[in-house]
Amino acid sequence: EILIGLVGSEMCIRDRSPCYVMDEKLLRKNLSLIKSVADRAGVEIILAFKSFAMWKSFPIFREYIRYTTASSVYEARLAYEEFGSKAHTYSPAYTDTDFPVIMRCSSHITFNSFSQFRRFYPMVEAFGEKITCGIRINPEYSEVEVELYNPCAPGTRFGVTADLLPETLPEGIEGFHCHCHCESSSYELEHTLQHIEEKFASWFPQIKWLNLGGGHLITRKDYD
């Protein structure tokens, strides 16, 4: 059971324990800050279910955040069926069984490789509803200190490096997706953007969007 209200209230604790308890006031404080950053920066901040998927709180989230990101068929369904908007979906690999559901529940689909894109893009074209597709890029830079968790570590299979991108992107690729942060600061984001621009700027005129992935700890006190 999930109860949303003021932590310590008799309603939440005395009569209905065990339960998950969320402090709505603190939640709204964080969401207000996140929305403020999005508005001032001119970006769209989307909710990652990988870190938070308490669906009972979605009505509150929808007041501040419009979209979510998914990494599986069930997260895509959660976005579409419970959050009320189609997901921005990325997965290292899709299956023939899951992909029709992924398409039904997604507005954006990112592929990890061009082989995955070539395999599934004909299904996107035949789907009948607009889905914008992208490719995950690897900037070969990350400040994640634990090598095990570094998606840009040598030998990684996450994303495509600049030397493997064709000069002209395949028809149907409209965006780039990058994920190389974990509880990161704005300074780490700044450094990442510099590397992305250095390696991938020549393709920018060909794309419509850039997804910078998760791991941005915006609510941390020292986040600039």
What are the language-model segments listed below?
Residues E1-G8, C12-I13:
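Single conserved hydrophobic/aromatic residue that forms the stacking wall/gate
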Residues V7, K50, G215-L217:
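Gly/Ser/Thr-rich beta-alpha loop segments that engage phosphate groups in nucleotides
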Residues S9-E10, E24-L31, R66-T68:
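Short, compositionally biased "basic patch" segments
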Residues R14-K25, D39-I45, S85:
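Glycine-rich phosphate-binding "P-loop"
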Residues V43-I207:
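Active-site-proximal beta-alpha core segment in soluble small-molecule metabolic enzymes
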Residues C180-H181, L210-T219:
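Glycine-rich beta-strand-to-loop/alpha-helix junction loops that act as flexible
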Residues R220-D224:
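Histidine/acidic-residue-rich catalytic or RNA/ligand-binding cores of hydrolases
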